[in-house]
Amino acid sequence: IHCLIRTYVEAGDEVLILAPFWPLIRGIVQAFRGVPVEVPFYDRIFDLEEALAALEERISERTVALYVSTPSNPTGRVLPGDWLEAFAEFARRRDLWLLSDEVYEDYVYRGEHVSLAPLAPERTVAVHSFSKAYGMAGNRVGYLAAPREWAAQARKIATHTFYGAPTPGQWAALRALEGGAAWIAESREAYREVGAQAAALLGQEAPAGSTFLFLDVSAQLGARGLEGFLADCFEDGVLVAPGASSGQDYGDWVRLCYTALPPEKALEAVRRLARRCGRDVPPVAAES
C-alpha cells in the first residue's frame, strides 16, 4: 500500500478513505504529503444512495483516489457487488483511482467477496496479502494487481524502498500457494466460529468477514475517557486498539482482534472485555 500511494499521490492530493479504516492508511497518505479525507461509512451507512451522497459531499478538485476495504478492517463488514459496481461507476465519472484493500478476501463468513478489479480494471489497484490469507505476517509478503503501466511504476518505488521481499518469505509464500487451500478452509471455519462467539459475548452482530470486532464503548467511559478504559483493560490482561486510529469519528471505540490467540484464550479475553463493558458474563466453569 505504501508503494501504491507513493506511485500516484502527490503533495496536496486528496484520497477519500471509507472509515473506520485500517489504522496505517491515513499515515501512509500523509507521509507523502497527501490529504486523507475520511468518510464515516462502515458503521453507519447501509443505503447505497446515502453512500454515494457521502462521497459526493467530500470530493473536491484535488481528489485523486478512493480507498475501499472489503472485508473491512476493523468492522468485518463485507460490501456486496452492487455497491462495488456503483463505486466503480462513481470513480469513472469522477476520474478517480480505486485503491482496493482485499487482504481479508479469504475470510468471508457471510455473503461473498467481490473484487473491485474486474469491475473497473483500468483504474483499480487491488492489494493482497499472504500475511492474512496464510497466517504469514512475519514473512512480509504481499502483492498488488494493477494496470500494467501503473504496476511498472510501483515496482520502481518498491525497488528503491525495500528492494525486494526476503527470499525465505517468498519461498514460504510459494509453498502456501501450492498447498495452503486446506489450511485456509480450516482457518476460515475456526475464525467464523470464534468471531460469532466473541460477538455474542459482547452483544454484537457476528462479523461477516475479517478477524476484527469494532466496539462503541462510550457508555463505559468515565472521567478518564478512553485512555482510562484502555488502562483498565490492560489491568484485566486484555489489549485492544483505540478506535481513533481508525478515524476521527471513533474516539470512543475500540478494535478487537479475535484471532490473536488460540480460540479459548481469545474468548477468555473477550469475556473479560465484556465484563469491563458491563455485560453479565459468568466465568467458564472449571473442569472437574
Please tell me what each predicted stretch does.
Residues 32, 93-94, 236:
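Helix C-cap/helix->beta junction micro-motif
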Residues 170, 174, 190-199, 204-218, ...:
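Conserved glycine-rich beta-strand-loop-beta hairpin in the small C-terminal domain of fold type I
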Residues 42-110:
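Active-site phosphate-binding strand-loop segment of PLP-dependent enzymes
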